[in-house]
Design a protein with these regions (language model features):
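Mid-domain Rossmann-like dinucleotide-binding core that forms the NAD(H)/NADP(H) cofactor-binding site
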Residues: 5-86
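Phosphate-coordination loops involved in phosphoryl transfer and adenosine-cofactor binding
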Residues: 31-33, 101, 123
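N-terminal Rossmann-like NAD(P) cofactor-binding module of classical short-chain dehydrogenase/reductase
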Residues: 81, 104-105
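C-terminal capping/lid region of NAD(P)-dependent oxidoreductase domains
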Residues: 176, 181-190, 198-220
């Protein structure tokens, strides 16, 4: 996009293509809806917060520390939930007067899944992007049936080149102008030369970062 340098631009495709394909394409996000984004300081998380706010949604997001909750608010989330201190499902229910949320963007899986299904509003959508906490869960499909819920999920990497190209074209048309006028910005936490790739991986595995970690060619 115009007005975005090459390092910042490197942090755009993976996370914004992924969140577009899931939150916009699969969940059909609309203005005025309410969204819960798990892992709000991850690359997927911050991209989801910023894109949802640009679409006119109310955003809840989770993180594990006070510092990360502050970052979530800086990204634009309306509600930052420290999941070590608060029950994210209760906060969402309380702040929506029991209605629940329209969309949950899940990057955790495991025992989060039944709790997320339980907090969806009528016609709500749960989209699963990653499953580090586990690929199996017990879900009350009576709720899915009675509340007309949708459970879906997808990843970018297994998609065909034409599918990825279509997603990129949609971003170019809709999201690139938001970057050009600074309505949306990227969040780069750290950059490393390729020779320090192991250090970058250690930082990522520590989960201390907020935003993207970028590997750069020497001299950039």
């Amino acid at each position: 996009p115009e007005n975005v340098d090459i390092i910042e631009a490197a942090g755009i495709p993976e996370v914004f293509c992924t969140i577009w394909a899931n939150m916009v394409d699969r969940c059909a996000l609309k203005a005025g809806e309410t969204v819960l984004i798990q892992g709000g300081t991850s690359g997927i998380g911050y991209a989801g917060i910023k894109l949802a706010k640009a679409f006119g949604a109310t955003v809840f997001a989770t993180a594990r520390t006070a510092e990360k909750c502050s970052a979530i608010r800086r990204f634009g989330a309306d509600y930052a939930i420290n999941y070590r201190e608060e029950d994210f499902a209760k906060v969402c229910h309380d702040q929506t007067t029991g209605r629940g949320v329209d969309i949950v963007v899940d990057i955790v899986g495991g025992d989060y899944l039944p709790r997320e299904v339980g907090l969806l509003a009528h016609g709500g959508r749960l989209v699963i992007i990653n499953l580090p906490a586990g690929k199996t869960a017990t879900v009350d499909f009576g709720l899915v049936h009675s509340k007309h819920l949708t459970i879906t999920g997808s990843r970018m990497r297994p998609r065909s080149i034409p599918e990825k190209a279509n997603i990129c074209r949609a971003l170019e048309k809709t999201v690139w102008p938001m970057f050009a006028n600074s309505e949306i910005t990227t969040e780069t936490y750290a950059t490393f030369p390729f020779s320090k790739a192991a250090d970058a991986h250690r930082l990522m595995e520590s989960s201390e970062h907020i935003g993207k970690i970028i590997l750069c060619s020497e001299g950039i």
